[in-house]
Amino acid sequence: YRTMVPRSGIEARPRYARAEGGVRYTGPVLLLTSDVTVSGGELATLGLRALPNVVQIGGTTRGSFSTVLAKPLPNGWVVELSNEVISGPDGEVFEEAGIAPEVPLEMFPLDDPVGGYFRALNKAIELMDADTAKQEDL
């Protein structure tokens, strides 16, 4: 992902996570997200989606990325202002809009949030089982 401070004159800076040596899992990964995937979870989603074996499923993330700049006020209060723009590797900004999944699933329907969560988990298991069966046929 990339970070930048708007109107600062400083260019956007790419952020990378470098792979370490040793054993790595390279099999399929389903990343389950929803509207309660926020902030650091969204940064993790951006990073994981860059991997070829990861598929995001579930709901669109919250769209609340930026870290805050906290400033104390004379009366003792603290004001916190969003001060960064975080984008995907291609420059797309997901602030407010969130990151839409590749495979949409309703995670927490208003009429049955717990049941919806378990239905989404079961669907994820079905997708993993289908992908495993497909790979075994190769």
Q: How should each PLM-predicted stretch be described?
A:
Residues 32-36, 58-61, 82-86:
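Active-site-proximal beta-strand/loop segments in catalytic clefts of secreted hydrolases
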Residues 38-44, 65-68, 90:
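Extracytoplasmic/secreted cell-surface and envelope-processing proteins
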Residues 18, 30-36, 106-114:
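Second-shell loop/turn segments in exported
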Residues 26, 41-45, 49, 97, ...:
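Extracytoplasmic/secreted envelope proteins and their assembly/folding machinery
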Residues 1-28, 66-72, 83-87, 93-94:
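Gly/Ser/Thr-rich loop/hinge elements
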Residues 87-138:
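Intrinsically disordered, Ser/Thr/Pro/Gly-rich linkers and terminal tails that flank
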Residues 38, 51-65:
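Short, well-structured beta-strand/strand-turn elements
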